């Protein structure tokens, strides 16, 4: 399994829909079944991700989220901001506005 963390709003769901990756999103109430050979894009940072992606600026990224997602995350106080800071400080993320198919292909090449 390849597991890639992307911050909310970076294009994870679009890539999953277009290329058939597993979309493991904490915003959705039901979780997908994950198989051994899947490529999983998630917005939950865990120790075992193969790569981490963050936007350059938390506030701008948060403001780009839909109003529903902003409301959802505001109910959890600083959860998303704390998550952003954790990934930034602990995991040496790739900083860019959006994740692309090319990024995923590069990760797959590195994993062999």
Regions found by a protein language model. Name each.
Residues 1-19:
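Glycine-rich phosphate-binding P-loop
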Residues 3-9, 40-42, 52-53:
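Ordered hydrophobic segments in well-structured contexts
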Residues 17-48:
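Conserved substrate/cofactor phosphate-moiety recognition/catalytic segment
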């Amino acid at each position: 399994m390849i597991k890639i963390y992307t911050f909310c709003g970076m294009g994870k769901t679009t890539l999953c829909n277009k290329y058939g990756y597993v979309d493991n999103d904490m915003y959705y109430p039901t979780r997908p079944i994950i198989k051994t050979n899947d490529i999983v894009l998630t917005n939950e940072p865990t120790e075992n991700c193969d790569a981490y992606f963050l936007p350059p600026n938390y506030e701008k990224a948060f403001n780009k989220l839909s109003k529903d997602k902003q409301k959802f995350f505001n109910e959890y106080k600083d959860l998303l901001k704390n998550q952003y800071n954790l990934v930034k400080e602990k995991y040496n993320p790739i900083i860019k506005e959006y994740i692309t198919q090319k990024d995923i292909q590069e990760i797959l090449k590195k994993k062999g």
